[in-house]
């Protein structure tokens, strides 16, 4: 993906295209 975002609610790291 190109967009990177942090999910503070779950403290997880995800990559969004």
UniProtKB/Swiss-Prot annotation:
Reactions the enzyme catalyzes: hydrogencarbonate + H(+) = CO2 + H2O
The EC number(s) this enzyme carries: 4.2.1.1
Keywords: Lyase
Keyword Lyase (UniProt): yes
GO molecular function terms listed in the Swiss-Prot or TrEMBL record: carbonate dehydratase activity
Family the UniProt entry places it in: Belongs to the beta-class carbonic anhydrase family.
Name listed for the protein in its UniProt record: Putative carbonic anhydrase
Organism encoding this protein: Streptococcus thermophilus
Lineage of the organism: Bacteria, Bacillati, Bacillota, Bacilli, Lactobacillales
